[in-house]
Amino acid sequence: MNNSEQLIALKESETAFLKYFNKADYELVDFSLVEKLDWKQLNHEDLQQMGERNFWQHEHQIYALRNDFTDQLLRYYSMYPTAATKVAYTGLIIRNNEAAVQVGLENYAPSLANVQQSLKLFIQFIQQQLRDNVHFVVLGHYQLLDALLDKSLQTPDILSMIEERNLSGLVTYLSTEHPIVQILKENTQQQLNVLEHYIPNDHPALVELKIWERWLHTQGYKDIHLDITAQPPRSYYTGLFIQCHFAENESRVLTGGYYKGSIEGFGLGLTL
């Protein structure tokens, strides 16, 4: 496929996404690539993200190029509430001076049923329009770390070793028998079963992970992995997250996660 054909295919995929979810009764939204920001309203995490963002000042006003749709929509709807419970978007995001096209969905005040329905529809779009399918799924939950590791041990060094799956370092700091070390020693396909030995069966994170595992099995997905190493990109990501890796285009990953800040929601996004 030459450059012109790739460009046409990309634009057609964006349009097809909007048509598909418009037909499914999602509200289509179109936000400017340029965000107007107020320094006084930016929190510590907003300021930390400025390192990857392109921003400038004009007449005492700060402007920045969008780097995350969920964050932009959350910021906007916090100021201007919407009655919409499910929205669909497409457009550019700019991170570290690199541009990419993203398509995605946001479910506000989400229920398990409507989030799973959104994921099901998204995968159907991938199958029908992108001619691809989900090869394997990664599940995780941002409450797991607190369940497995005492707050006093959640130092930058230890968190970094967990993220890097540095078992030798973790053994030194935590011990061989520590739950995190024991879980990480297992194949990721087995870790969800092993997790049951280290946290109560009624722990909300484990209950939710098991519900999703069962639902994914009913959808025909058996290759399911647990990730206990991921740490939330923003503090409002407090619950379950999911990554659906593609069979044909291995660079593509459909990602999603639950968040609760000024607005509660569950987002699903895919970079084309």
UniProtKB/Swiss-Prot annotation:
Gene3D superfamilies (UniProt xref): Bira Bifunctional Protein, Domain 2
Gene Ontology cellular component list: cytoplasm
MF terms (GO), sorted A to Z: catalytic activity, acting on a protein; transferase activity
Keyword field: Amino-acid biosynthesis, Cytoplasm, Histidine biosynthesis
Keyword Cytoplasm appears in the UniProt entry: yes
Presence of keyword Lipoprotein: no
Alphabetized InterPro entries for the sequence: aa-tRNA-synth_II/BPL/LPL, HisRS-like_core, HisZ
Pathways per UniProt: Amino-acid biosynthesis; L-histidine biosynthesis; L-histidine from 5-phospho-alpha-D-ribose 1-diphosphate: step 1/9
Major subcellular site: cytoplasm
Location within or outside the cell: Cytoplasm
One Gene Ontology term from the biological process aspect of the record: L-histidine biosynthetic process
Protein's job: Required for the first step of histidine biosynthesis. May allow the feedback regulation of ATP phosphoribosyltransferase activity by histidine.
Misc: This function is generally fulfilled by the C-terminal part of HisG, which is missing in some bacteria such as this one.
Quaternary structure (record): Heteromultimer composed of HisG and HisZ subunits.
Family: Belongs to the class-II aminoacyl-tRNA synthetase family. HisZ subfamily.
Name this protein carries in UniProt: ATP phosphoribosyltransferase regulatory subunit
Gene from which this protein is expressed: hisZ
